[in-house]
Amino acid sequence: MYTATDVVVLSSSPDQIPSLTLAKPKCDAEKAFVLSPVSSSPSALPSASELFQPPTRSRFFKTGDGNEGSSRTAREESETGTKQNDLAASRRKRAARGGRQKRTKEQPTNESQTLFDHPEPPIPKHVGCTSKKGTGSKKKRTDAANKCTKSENKTITGKVTKPGITETTKSEDKTKELVTADVSTGKSPANKLELEKDGLQLEVAMKRRLDWTPTKDTGKQAVALDDTGDNKTRFGELLSEYGFLKAATDSQGDSKLSDGAPTKRRRLELVDTRTPSTSKRTSPDADSDRSNVRSTRSSKAPAAEGKPKKRSRKITTLTGRVTALYTNDCTDHLDAANTMISPSDDVSSKLFSKSLDIDSCVLPPEDAVDYLKDQDLIFGTCSQLEREDSPTMLRDMQKAIRASENSMIENRKPSSTTRAGSGLYSHTAVSRFQTPRDLWSVAARDMDGSLAEIEVLDMVDITDISELPPKPNGELPDRSEKNDKDTVSQGESFRPVEITDEVEVEVDVRTENLATSETNPGETACGASELRPRPRFADWKDSDLLKQVRLYGFKPMKSRRKMIEVLERCWKAQHVSTRTGVQDVPGKPDDGSAGKAGTIKSQTNKQASKMDAAEKTRKASACLKEEAKSSTALEDKPSHAADGSSQVLTKSSFADVEEIEDSEDEVIPSPSRLQSRYKRHISESRSSQPLSVSATPSTPSSPTRTNADSGTKPSPFGLAAESRLPDLASQITKAVRLQPRSFSVDCKRPSWHEKILMYDPIILEDFATWLNIEGLGLVHEDREVSAEFVRQWCESNGICCGFRKNSRQSER
């Protein structure tokens, strides 16, 4: 069998030489896709040792078709005759020649395909021609292929690969240009014709390998290429889904919105009724989605058109009520525009119209403040809710409230406050009741909770004590019925003077500082010489008026009329107080009418005494100083001590401290009562129980607390209390209260009582010196006190005191 095989190979060996030479033009650079050119030198002829190698030949074709090899062996063994051997030999020779011719044509194509797709070794076209192959010819072809590829072809090792794997392993090739060229050959018709011309017939090879390869539909490759192109377009459609779609946004926003307060978001359907914008998607799924959205919006449109009618019944908060004046107009404009705008209109036109409407609501700062003043607001907690029947219900309610208030004011009797504000003080700025709606008149209410009718009394016009205030149901006399100021008598009153507020404060302060008792005989004697007929200030010159105004302690005024009115008023007050001679009797009335009369009397007396002392005290200051040291001054000076509590460093006055002391009459009597008690019962006061001095005007305390402190805490002056002489501590208290006030306007030297009231630190040495020289002499006390005794008295009364720094190391 080896002999027969050797003969066949030797006879066919010369035919392999031309096949190597014919492969040269087929493996040029153009068809090898930029591969290195094939060497032009012919390869050497194979040696005899290479040709006669049966194991190599059988090992090389071991991966071939085993079925054909076995059938060929069976046919050779079955042949027994020489004739059959000759026929078989001739048939194999012809098949070998035909196979060599086919291989010479298909060899370049198979080699190029091996470079691209890495397939198995070339397979002949016909079935019968695969049995006879020479080992020498196979070696020569392998050497020629290695020279052409220059070690780039790594798959000519007899390894068989599947056709499906060849498609998936294209991206793993090192030469990307070859892969892209192979993919492009499936699309271009020129490459297809070239492949058919070269004779690459893969269908036959696939059929031959059905024995060991599973059945696979090869037609899916073309479909896969088409699907790849479709996937590219579908991937772009998937990306388009991530774009902004107005229709989808509107549908999502519509499902989240609901009816609420004006400050919440509204439905977009009420504003935007246009058709959704066209999308760039072309797939049927996108078209169906868009049609579904359009149908959904069209179905919701009829239901949404009837919903704005429920706005009048919705629940609003305080913020919504306040902002309703601005939001209602804008929303009404949008509702009216919604019915007129067609669905094809652009959104920009609506936004432009809405912006114009909002801009029209903005006002300048001045107009905004004026509009805010006229705005009606209802205040309440944020949790308080109210249902409104119409947008104008709030304004109608405010109008009804105002109408009811006006009707109540017209029906009720006019109060004296209104009359005083309209007729009595309409042309003056001096009066404290310049306007009827001050704080106290607004806040004053009776037991039923209604506004109380406050009576305003003109203390300047009340010239006689017999003139009582009118009854509540009566009316004040008309000011127009009074005579002119030129023809009025001395007993009649004058109209109030128009003076600025600064002058009013100066009048009150100066008259309080310069006021003295009307029962002083020394002042009466000095002032009696000054009585004369009322001068005509209208005939005076401006310079004389200024001098006279300065005498009364007022600043110069620019208006001549104001100066004349001030001078006439001051002169009238002096002479009226001198003629009437009203005494100030403290006490509390039993009934309401008596209380009003007593209040009017006290106010009248104070006003008269203040205006009377304005001129007399300045002209008779010399006689006042002389009488201050005499016994007559002891009867007159209690009024100064009573008024001393109202003396302050500033020009404004404050509440009278003596009024606070009156509530403790049983514990701490007023200075006037102490003086009168001491004068009337001097013998009884020496033997009486000493008064408690634990409470002072600066820190008033209740009688219960005073008695408790005096009972539980032993007094440091217990030894002095046992004697028949009055307690020295009580004498110091009386002396402090009886010290005359300083008459300086600026109060640079306040009295000791004033220093105690203002919590000024008391220097013990100075205070003791004053008591020994002047203070104790006011109460007819001949004893002297030391600084240490004064310190004990100050500490017992809670007065801030201390020694001088140079005289004592410690200061309290």
Swiss-Prot record:
Chief subcellular location: nucleus
Basic and acidic residues bias locations: 169-179, 282-292, 476-487, 612-640
Matches recorded under InterPro entries: Slx4_ascomycetes, Structure-sp_endonuc_su_Slx4
Residues annotated as signal peptide: none
Biased composition (Basic residues): 90-103
GO terms (BP aspect): DNA recombination; DNA repair; DNA replication
Compositionally skewed regions (Polar residues) per UniProt: 644-653
Keyword vocabulary terms for this entry: DNA damage, DNA recombination, DNA repair, Nucleus, Phosphoprotein
Entry PTM: Phosphorylated in response to DNA damage.
GO molecular function: 5'-flap endonuclease activity
Chain spans, region Disordered: 36-194, 212-231, 249-312, 465-494, 575-719
GO cellular component, one term: Slx1-Slx4 complex
Location(s) in or outside the cell: Nucleus
Low complexity bias: start-end ranges: 36-49, 690-706
Covalent S-S links between cysteines: none
CDD domains the record matches: SAP_SLX4
Compositionally biased spans, kind Acidic residues: 656-667
Pfam families for the chain: Slx4 (PF09494)
Highest taxon listed in the record's lineage: Eukaryota
Role of this protein: Regulatory subunit of the slx1-slx4 structure-specific endonuclease that resolves DNA secondary structures generated during DNA repair and recombination. Has endonuclease activity towards branched DNA substrates, introducing single-strand cuts in duplex DNA close to junctions with ss-DNA.
Subunit structure: Forms a heterodimer with slx1.
HAMAP family per the UniProt record, alphabetical: Endonuc_su_Slx4
Sequence similarity: Belongs to the SLX4 family.
Protein name (database record): Structure-specific endonuclease subunit slx4
Naturally occurring in which organism (per UniProt): Neosartorya fischeri (strain ATCC 1020 / DSM 3700 / CBS 544.65 / FGSC A1164 / JCM 1740 / NRRL 181 / WB 181)
Source species taxonomy: Eukaryota, Fungi, Dikarya, Ascomycota, Pezizomycotina
Gene: slx4
